[in-house]
Amino acid sequence: MTTLDPSDIRILEAVQDDGRLTNQALADQVGMSTSPSWRKVRKLEEDGVIQGYRATLGRKAIGLGVLAFVRIKIDSHSEAEAEQFAAELMSLDEVITCYSIAGDADFLLQVVSHDLDTYADFAMSTLRRLPRIKEMQTTFVLKETKSFTGFPLKHARSVKTGA
């Protein structure tokens, strides 16, 4: 277990804002020399705090005009069957996030599609055909007013992390 210190937080804020920073630019931005900066980044990666680096793509710019949330109830709640169902969902490219949730549904999916017709085909020929689905409800996003840009770090200062 490690505790995130103020320099860790500065590094996380910087790489979350721009994952393409060179080690020199990162060190300059967070007020450290390059060697300690590099060691801290490696430690944050090893501890699973930094889990990867990727480009953020414009959903509409790559032809994915439909964003939907799908609530799914399954007919069996055994741990093994729920895990198998989740694994089947994870294999679907259109499902970009999947959450096991509490409440009146078992899973919440975030799904992207080219258009409504393509979504309808996916929902009817792929999702609905998965075993154990008892109920499925789709909510379409009309306008994305705020998309994910990173996690807030103001409360992370005393968080303990572990590998």
Go through the PLM ranges and name each one.
Residues 1-163:
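A compositional/biophysical signature of low hydrophobicity enriched in polar/charged and small residues
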